[in-house]
């Protein structure tokens, strides 16, 4: 799992990234990896990665969140979690495995994701009721709104408690949630995949 790859300005347009990707493909093949996935950081990178054998296969839809004006249930406690906790990974992994189609991250991947959150100004919120995890959300700050990358909750009360805590913590009232692609909603390109071991696949 790599979070953020870029080339030093002095070495751009010299094939450094192409060589890095070629070496990573060879290493993945040796390690028995069947396919590689990535999320381009900028729209123009979709074309670049397509030239390296990747295809745009993952899409997402969005939903604007409108918070009702009332205080959430007091028995649901929401906190910001700045560091990796295995209990949170287990909950998130369980909830994501309930989706029809979803990339599952390993425990090691999740540790990198938590580090990336700290670097990129994101947050992980966890909702607990009687010390049991009932919901988790991962957010990033956009220019004028919050981007909700993941939102898993046991019920609407927990979901609202998480959203209310986001607004209280960040001061942002506008939130946009990223969702699995929905037929009735516009779909946007998100991620790409490349087969590494064609014979095995």
Give residue spans per PLM region:
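Amide-forming acyltransferase catalytic core, primarily the GNAT-like/NAT-type
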Residues: 55-151, 156-157
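Conserved acetyl-CoA-binding loop-helix of GNAT-fold acetyltransferases
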Residues: 4-7, 13-26, 156-168
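Core nucleotidyl-transferase/polymerase catalytic module
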Residues: 3-5, 43-44, 56, 62
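Conserved beta-strand segments that form the floor/walls of ligand-binding pockets within enzyme
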Residues: 1, 6, 147
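Short polybasic/polar patches that bind polyanions
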Residues: 12, 29, 50
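Conserved GNAT acetyl-CoA-binding A-motif
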Residues: 21, 28-41, 170-181
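Active-site/acyl-donor-binding loops of N-acyltransferases
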Residues: 50-72, 149-156, 160-201
């Amino acid at each position: 799992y790599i979070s953020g790859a870029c080339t030093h300005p002095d070495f751009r347009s010299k094939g450094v990234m192409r060589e890095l990707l070629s070496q990573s493909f060879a290493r993945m093949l040796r390690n028995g990896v069947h396919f590689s996935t990535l999320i381009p950081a900028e729209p123009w990178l979709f074309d670049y990665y397509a030239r390296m054998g990747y295809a745009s296969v993952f899409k997402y839809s969005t939903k604007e969140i409108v918070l009702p004006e009332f205080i959430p249930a007091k028995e649901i406690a929401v906190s910001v979690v700045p560091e990796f906790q295995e209990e949170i990974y287990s909950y998130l992994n369980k909830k994501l495995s309930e989706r029809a189609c979803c990339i599952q991250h390993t425990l090691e991947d999740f540790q990198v994701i938590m580090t990336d959150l700290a670097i990129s100004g994101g947050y992980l919120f966890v909702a607990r009721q009687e010390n049991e995890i009932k919901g988790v959300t991962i957010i990033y700050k956009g220019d004028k709104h919050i981007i909700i990358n993941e939102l898993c909750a046991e019920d609407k009360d927990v979901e609202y408690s998480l959203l209310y805590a986001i607004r209280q913590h960040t001061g942002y009232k506008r939130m946009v949630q990223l969702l699995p692609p929905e037929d009735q909603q516009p779909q946007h390109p998100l991620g790409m995949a490349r087969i590494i071991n064609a014979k095995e696949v």
